[in-house]
Amino acid sequence: MPLDGGKPKYRRILLKFSGEALIGEVGYGIDPKVVQQIALELQELNRIGIEIGLVVGGGNIFRGAGLAAVGMDRVTGDHMGMLATVMNALALQDALERLGVFCRVMSAIRINEVCEDYLRRRAIRHLEKGRLVIFAAGTGNPFFTTDTAASLRAIEIGAELLIKATKVDGVYSADPLVNSDAQFISRLSYDQVIERKLAVMDTTAIIMCRDHSLPLRVFDMHKVGALTHIIKGEDVGTLVSRE
């Protein structure tokens, strides 16, 4: 969806997708249709000059915390989860490059044959040159989620907004997919998210956003054009900020 002459409110953003967001209708792994739709939305933002960083989870392929609960060493499981995020990042890179979008995958762990090492200054330079940057392998450390990685990378690159893509159109008082009485919440403070234990992002990620005054927008990734509306400054989904 084009901006139709409207001026974008944000010039540099960090977008967070869960690995599960890529499953689509296939039940497991990566649905090419979902990846293509995400790539098309990002292509439009890239075309109008928005600098985009992207963090994707790996839960569609592997979830280390789940196997740790049944006996696997947690550090080993988390390392396997990091590799799953690299696989998702490469799939998104491929889809974007087929649309003509210059894209770089930067990994927090060294896999030089398939992607670049993450270096903050190099990542910012890629963004300034109009390249979309996908940050893979989380923070590179076990016990930290990709939500925390998204907050960290957003702060490091100086993003004006952190955007989290979900299956519902924002934050609710309870899971709307299982509770029909769940109420939509359009605005929250960081402290309200923490105090009410709302499932927005993990607590570490929210605290980082709060401490660095990084606004967070939660929206429904399945709504075509929603990202463009957010970039224009429209009130889409739920805004988490100091106010």
From Swiss-Prot:
**InterPro entries cross-referenced by the UniProt entry:** AceGlu_kinase-like_sf (IPR036393), Asp/Glu/Uridylate_kinase (IPR001048), Uridylate_kinase (IPR011817), Uridylate_kinase_bac (IPR015963)
User: What positions does the entry give for ATP binding?
Assistant: K16, F17, S18, G19, G59, R63, T166, Y172, D175
- What Gene Ontology terms describe what this protein does at the molecular function level? ATP binding; UMP kinase activity
User: Top EC class per UniProt?
Assistant: transferase
Is this entry keyworded Kinase?
yes
What does the UniProt record note about how this protein's activity is regulated?
Answer: Allosterically activated by GTP. Inhibited by UTP.
- Which pathway does it take part in? Pyrimidine metabolism; CTP biosynthesis via de novo pathway; UDP from UMP (UMPK route): step 1/1
Q: Which residues bind UMP?
A: G58, D78, T139, G140, N141, P142, F143, F144, T145, T146
The region called Involved in allosteric activation by GTP is annotated at 24-29
Q: Name one GO biological process term.
A: 'de novo' CTP biosynthetic process
Catalytic activity reported: UMP + ATP = UDP + ADP
Q: Provide the protein's localization.
A: Cytoplasm
- Could you tell me which SUPFAM superfamilies the record lists for this protein? Carbamate kinase-like
Question: What EC number(s) are associated with this protein in UniProt?
Answer: 2.7.4.22
Entry GO terms, CC: cytosol
Keyword annotations from UniProtKB, A to Z: Allosteric enzyme, ATP-binding, Cytoplasm, Kinase, Nucleotide-binding, Pyrimidine biosynthesis, Transferase
Name the Pfam families for this protein: AA_kinase (PF00696)
Q: How does it assemble?
A: Homohexamer.
Function noted in UniProt: Catalyzes the reversible phosphorylation of UMP to UDP.
Against HAMAP family, the record matches this protein to:
PyrH_B
Q: Which family does it belong to?
A: Belongs to the UMP kinase family.
Q: What is this protein called?
A: Uridylate kinase
